[in-house]
Amino acid sequence: FIWIRHAPVEKEKGYVPDYDPNARYNVSAAEQLGRVMPENAHWIISPLKRTRQTAEQVRQHLNHQAQYPLSEHIEPDIIEQDLGSWAGAQLADVWEELAPLPKHNFSFQRAETQPPNGERFADQCLRIATYLHTQEVRIAAEKDTRTHVMFAHAHTIRAVISHCFRLDPDTALSIAIDNYSRTIFDYLPPEPEGNSTLTPAGGNWQLRGLNIPATEP
């Protein structure tokens, strides 16, 4: 699974970005990603505009036919955390609401912070864990060894890391995930009971790369 955070988004100074803004096009980053896209992969894309636009940006810079996706799927389950009424609001107003709440060193919110009419990061982690568990079951049943390129969001990728490494959500919020970066996981399905050489040590997910810049191969 190659998780790609979308391009930067259009936003107004002094305001929280809207929930579904357009992506800003960085030609150099899209070109670099186009060069390193795997062959014969399946692309899974969050339905928000910024991820769909990023996938299209990268597609324009693929180097050869084998890099074009075997299939594409829009997946609502990997959508970004919904900030509810905070999306598009003035930053000063949001900070005023957050002032009396518990603080986080590296995020404006704690995992348990409840955005008005929105979704807690802790709840997003549960949502992503459910999605990944479904993928784990499918991979084991189908013996699927295909590569999946996932065009998603910073908090989605943090939630993925939380699930794969059993990190508490507040710790996952401390992980930097940059625009156009790749975070790569391999999944090792458990073998049938009674016929397994695997141990519980290490879990079933291996991190191959974290927050890899688009400029690196």
Set out the residue ranges of the language-model regions.
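Active-site-proximal alpha-helix that buttresses catalytic centers in soluble enzyme cores
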Residues: F1-A66
